[in-house]
């Protein structure tokens, strides 16, 4: 027993103080002592206690929203009142200077390829105390850009289309950066972020203390980053494509046998990809990104329906926009092969019906696209099933027109016209000549009947 105790004491390498624990429990010395006592008895759980401490620090650092107070009557002009309110909001908002402040980290990953807002390799960081997601220059060690975690509205993890090697794009969309909702006056706007993670194990991912993580069996870099983000996003979750929502009729071009979740489309002359997700429709990956959240969509309709392609017209309204203030986005040159899947997605969420827009705005789909209430979904599906979609009508009319053209089509005779059939004008002239001949024959018969036997003495050409 004595030898075991001495041996255990000799192998201890726990530092006297741990920064994450010191920061988290600075105001609770008795609790901090209990944590250190537990670490002394079970040193193998140091990483666990550090994670708990960092999470506690992040909770303490998050600003608490005070309960809404009734607005007081103001004798001043309404414009002046709005200006004062906006100034207060801007003062309470976190600034870019806060994003770049030096603070302890919870997680960082080196050599991450960013595509937005800058195209370069940077270190991805998540801070412990202040709750920021940010990117640091690996040469200068300066923070290039970032966003407070509580200002993030959507995080998407999407497979990169048309790549031989499997990769994932993480798209972080802060408040007012979705391409639809403009910022209020004086509000700080943080840029959207896009970075790429290759499929496979994480090679340079670390905890805040510098311990390498992500090397567990079966854990990939994508699943690690997604897990870390979900642990730090209290109000939303990372959204991935789901074949129950939409899957393309065409498989991945460069990875045979793998399902594709994107649809190629154009916005103006800019080519991009559409993803139909559980929380909305995303168009990327080039600036500017656009995310059509369900609560912003008024309706979706089809335009420019052709044999091989069609367009989607998405009407949206911003959160602070008036009821009649809508803007439209046209996504063009979508392959007809994906019509059925897109149409099913639109009907499932009732996006073809503008009368359901207010219900979508009121609901806001709790936990970033958790299940909608079944009654609303079933009603939307039932209403959609009774209606023939605009695209189906257009397709039916196009087919009817083609059938009529085929019935009227005359391939012509193999005469001396260099192999071409007769035109419709020639057909009309031939019909007129035939009618004139019939009329003349009828007149001759009538004259002969009137003259009777005397007609024999009349020359044939005078009848």
From Swiss-Prot:
Interacts with histones H3 and H4. Keywords: Chaperone, Chromosome, DNA-binding, Nucleus, Transcription, Transcription regulation. The keyword Transcription applies. It comes from Aspergillus clavatus (strain ATCC 1007 / CBS 513.65 / DSM 816 / NCTC 3887 / NRRL 1 / QM 1276 / 107). The keyword Disulfide bond does not apply. Coiled coil: none annotated. Transmembrane segments: none annotated. This is Histone chaperone rtt106. InterPro entries: PH-like_dom_sf, RTT106/SPT16-like_middle_dom, RTT106/SSRP1_HistChap/FACT. Residues 85-95 have a biased composition (Polar residues). GO terms for molecular function: DNA binding; histone binding; nucleosome binding.
């Amino acid at each position: 027993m004595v030898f075991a105790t001495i041996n255990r004491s000799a192998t201890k390498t726990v530092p006297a103080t741990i920064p994450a624990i010191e920061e988290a429990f600075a105001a609770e010395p008795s609790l901090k002592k209990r944590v250190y006592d537990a670490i002394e008895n079970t040193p193998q759980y140091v990483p666990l206690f550090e994670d708990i401490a960092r999470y506690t620090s992040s909770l303490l650092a998050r600003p608490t929203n005070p309960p809404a107070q009734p607005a007081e009557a103001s004798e001043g002009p309404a414009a002046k009142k709005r200006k004062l309110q906006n100034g207060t909001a801007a003062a309470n908002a976190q600034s870019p200077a806060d994003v770049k402040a030096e603070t302890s980290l919870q997680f960082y990953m080196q050599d991450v390829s960013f595509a937005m807002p800058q195209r370069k390799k940077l270190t991805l960081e998540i801070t412990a105390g202040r709750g920021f997601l940010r990117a640091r220059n690996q040469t200068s060690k300066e923070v290039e850009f970032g966003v407070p975690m509580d200002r993030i509205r959507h995080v998407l993890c999407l497979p990169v289309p048309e790549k031989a090697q499997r990769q994932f794009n993480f798209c972080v969309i802060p408040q007012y950066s979705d391409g639809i909702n403009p910022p209020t006056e004086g509000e700080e706007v943080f840029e959207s972020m896009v970075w790429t993670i290759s499929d496979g194990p994480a090679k340079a991912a670390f905890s805040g203390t510098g311990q390498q993580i992500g090397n567990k069996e079966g854990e990939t870099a994508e699943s690690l980053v997604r897990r870390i983000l979900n642990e730090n996003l209290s109000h939303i979750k990372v959204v991935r494509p789901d074949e129950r929502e939409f899957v393309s009729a065409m498989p991945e071009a460069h990875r045979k046998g793998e399902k594709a979740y994107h649809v190629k489309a154009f916005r103006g002359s800019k080519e991009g990809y559409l993803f139909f997700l559980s929380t909305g429709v995303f168009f990327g990956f080039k600036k500017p990104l656009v995310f059509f959240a369900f609560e912003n969509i008024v309706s979706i309709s089809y335009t420019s329906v052709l044999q091989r392609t069609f367009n989607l017209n998405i009407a949206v309204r911003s959160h602070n926009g008036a009821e009649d203030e809508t803007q439209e986005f046209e996504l063009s040159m979508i392959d007809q092969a994906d019509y059925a899947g897109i149409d099913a997605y639109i009907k499932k969420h009732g996006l073809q019906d503008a009368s359901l827009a207010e219900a979508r705005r009121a609901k806001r789909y709790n936990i970033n696209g958790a299940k909608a209430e079944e009654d609303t979904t079933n009603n939307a599906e039932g209403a959609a099933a009774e209606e023939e979609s605009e695209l189906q009508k257009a397709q039916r009319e196009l087919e009817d027109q083609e059938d009529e053209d085929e019935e009227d089509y005359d391939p012509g005779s193999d005469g001396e016209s260099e192999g071409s059939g007769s035109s419709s004008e020639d057909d009309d002239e031939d019909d007129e000549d035939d009618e004139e001949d019939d009329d003349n024959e009828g007149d001759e018969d009538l004259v002969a009947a009137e003259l009777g036997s005397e007609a024999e003495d009349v020359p044939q050409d005078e009848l």
